[in-house]
């Protein structure tokens, strides 16, 4: 990777710096999402003993552990809650820049890859929202980068670190088990081709210790997940998409902001073609160092899909939903590598045109405000401040709709409102001093002749 700094490289640096600033702004200013609030209320706020006594798929263990540390060290705020994800986002942006620079040089293709890997709305949200998906994606990408560096110049230390990163990605989000296992398996199989054209000299004698890397990967994930998973019940783990079709449809809708069936159908066909083409391209580049990115990512995409389908069929596990964010780099990287490696000008121009259309779509729906997962609760913080002002120091009993319950409990802790009685997750059959209602329970306002103190499209505060 040459140390030159061209216009495209400077543009990418300024763009990534601006994106980081937006991530920081959102982390500081946006209301907590239901997933963030649920995780805090069940697994971060309680004592370690209580938190470890139960587990569900919303508990992204590595993120939970780091958030416990950050909120204890800096006091509970939206920023301290999201600080681990924000730092993981910095890591992801750095890895994307480094990988794109190393494999795609500079120029339009370099900028296209950087944009496609960072501007997708799903990725933008993940880079600061207090969930484990962005963290898992960052560690998985770092593992891929370390493996690719070791392909070019063998380094056992980097391979060991890559195995640790893969384990951390699984600990950050369980859906990353499939791509983590797939990447490690593909690399270990690829490394058996040492000694072929393009492989660094000395690699034959320094083949990566497959069992050791697999053990490092397993132990890293095991240390963080063993105790929580020991308390898990299948009903709390078996939550997700019922088919790979549903997974692709949801990823496409969130990425492009449309639920058109024809777009989803095109995405499904394209993914299938990419997986098949990835296998063939991997075979062609299998033993060549300069084709390592295409070989590893193409084969990893195909094997990941195989693992998901096999696990669903024989282990009855669900398909991932938000956790399928790894499909973004697993499609962008091999496609770009294959097109640029082919040196076909027509294909390269077509790729840049399609990339421009996608990037324009991403920019048009850039999520500078509330996170998609909590868009209906964008006014939660304003509501909580209104409730705090109205309640004063009096002991108050608050009734909340089931969907709003974890959010109000979060703000009870956030603003240290000990005078608010803990909000229970129960139907609104009793009488309360204040009501926090979602549209499904809005009829209570008329039925009980309540006075509305605050209202937006997703939440209503009444007394």
PLM region descriptions:
Residues 12, 16-193, 205-351, 355-461:
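Membrane-proximal helix-loop-helix interfaces that form the catalytic/acceptor-binding platform
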């Amino acid at each position: 990777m040459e140390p030159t700094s061209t216009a495209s490289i400077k543009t990418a640096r300024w763009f990534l710096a601006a994106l980081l600033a937006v991530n920081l702004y959102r982390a500081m200013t946006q209301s907590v999402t239901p997933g963030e609030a649920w995780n805090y209320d069940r697994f971060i706020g309680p004592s370690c003993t209580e938190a470890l006594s139960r587990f569900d798929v919303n508990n992204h263990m590595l993120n939970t552990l780091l958030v416990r540390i950050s909120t204890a060290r800096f006091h509970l705020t939206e920023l301290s809650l999201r600080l681990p994800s924000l730092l993981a986002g910095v890591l992801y942006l750095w890895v994307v820049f480094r990988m794109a620079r190393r494999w795609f040089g500079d120029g339009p293709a370099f900028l296209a890859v950087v944009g496609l890997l960072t501007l997708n709305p799903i990725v933008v949200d993940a880079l600061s929202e207090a969930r484990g998906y962005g963290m898992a994606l960052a560690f998985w990408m770092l593992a891929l980068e370390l493996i690719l560096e070791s392909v070019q110049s063998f380094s056992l230390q980097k391979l060991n670190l890559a195995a640790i990163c893969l384990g951390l990605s699984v600990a950050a989000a369980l859906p990353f088990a499939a791509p983590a296992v797939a990447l490690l398996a593909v690399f270990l199989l690829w490394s058996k081709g040492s000694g072929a054209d393009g492989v660094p000299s000395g690699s034959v004698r320094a083949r990566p210790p497959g069992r050791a890397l697999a053990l490092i990967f397993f132990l890293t994930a095991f240390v963080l997940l063993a105790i929580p998973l020991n308390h898990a019940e299948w009903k709390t783990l078996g939550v997700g998409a019922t088919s790979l079709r549903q997974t692709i449809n949801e990823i496409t809708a969130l990425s492009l902001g449309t639920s058109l069936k024809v777009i989803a159908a095109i995405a499904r066909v394209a993914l299938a073609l990419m997986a098949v083409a990835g296998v063939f391209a991997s075979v062609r580049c299998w033993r060549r160092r300069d084709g390592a990115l295409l070989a590893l990512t193409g084969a990893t995409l195909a094997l990941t899909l195989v693992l998901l389908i096999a696990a669903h069929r024989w282990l009855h596990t669900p398909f991932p939903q938000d956790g399928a964010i790894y499909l973004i780099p697993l499609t962008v990287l091999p496609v770009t590598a294959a097109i640029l490696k082919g040196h076909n000008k027509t294909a390269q121009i077509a790729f840049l045109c399609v990339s421009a259309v996608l990037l324009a779509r991403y920019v048009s729906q850039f999520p500078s405000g509330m996170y998609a997962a909590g868009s209906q609760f964008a006014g939660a913080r304003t509501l909580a401040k209104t409730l705090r002002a109205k309640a004063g120091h009096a002991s108050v009993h608050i009734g909340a709709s089931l969907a709003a319950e974890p959010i109000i409990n979060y703000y009870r802790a956030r603003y240290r409102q000990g005078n608010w009685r803990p909000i229970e997750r129960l139907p609104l059959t009793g009488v309360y001093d204040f009501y926090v209602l979602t549209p499904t329970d809005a009829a209570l306002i008329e039925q009980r002749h309540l006075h509305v103190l605050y209202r937006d499209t997703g939440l209503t505060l009444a007394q």
